[in-house]
Design a protein with these regions (language model features):
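Histidine-centered nuclease catalytic patch
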Residues: 1-26, 102-134, 143
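Contiguous alpha-helical segments
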Residues: 20, 30, 34-104, 110, ...
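Long C-terminal interaction/binding lobes of large macromolecular proteins
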Residues: 168-184
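Proteins with a high burden of low-complexity, intrinsically disordered sequence enriched in S/T/G/P/A and R
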Residues: 1-3, 93, 183-184
Length: 185
């Protein structure tokens, strides 16, 4: 609940559609940010997948809800850290080693079709060895600057809230698997 207004904000279930009674739900700022432009069914499935992978619930995993990314480059991380005025203390060998490991949040593995990136576990710190974890782009975006505990706690609450929600069986591969950028177009 937003303390200033006394109520949650709102979000569209499917961002491709207009704000209508059928397509609008109450949504806190954290959930709204984490969901981004994802279809609500994908967001709920990702929440269940992560909670299952983390062994916080007995549920299903939906690896198809986490898209593949191949353009993960050391130089882009160096540039991004400099641009955001973050300490960057990783060498290329460490970077190359960490991005081939499974995502610490959802378990997505790097392979010839996908490469994980690097998450700063504590977003208040820079890219130092002790603070870096292998992370897929989708989990990195969802976690954002939230603490790991806040992030998992919110996903757990989402999954509990939607434990009896049946996600649409009519989702086509486009909605299930494509990233935010593609859905926004």
């Amino acid at each position: 609940v937003n303390e200033k207004r006394g109520f949650h904000g709102m979000d569209r279930k499917d961002n491709r559609l207009a704000y209508t009674n059928e397509n609008t739900v109450a949504c806190c700022a954290i959930c709204n940010y984490m969901k981004g432009s994802l279809h609500h069914d994908v967001f709920i499935r990702r929440s269940e997948h992560i909670m299952s992978y983390q062994k916080m619930i007995e549920g299903k995993e939906y690896p198809e809800c986490f898209v593949n990314v191949t353009h993960v480059q050391f130089v882009n991380y160096v540039y991004g850290a400099k641009k955001r005025k973050l300490e960057f203390n990783l060498d290329e060998e460490f970077f190359d080693d960490i991005v081939i490991q499974p995502c610490y949040i959802c378990g997505k593995k790097s392979d010839d079709k996908h490469r994980n990136g690097v998450d700063r576990y504590d977003s208040k710190q820079g890219y130092i060895v002790e603070n870096c974890k292998p992370c897929c782009r989708e989990c990195n975006f969802m976690k954002s600057d939230f603490t790991y505990c806040t992030f998992l706690d919110k996903l757990y609450k989402i999954r509990i809230q939607h434990r009896n929600t049946t996600t649409s069986e009519q989702l086509n591969g486009y909605i299930k698997c494509e990233s935010r950028k593609l859905l926004a177009n």
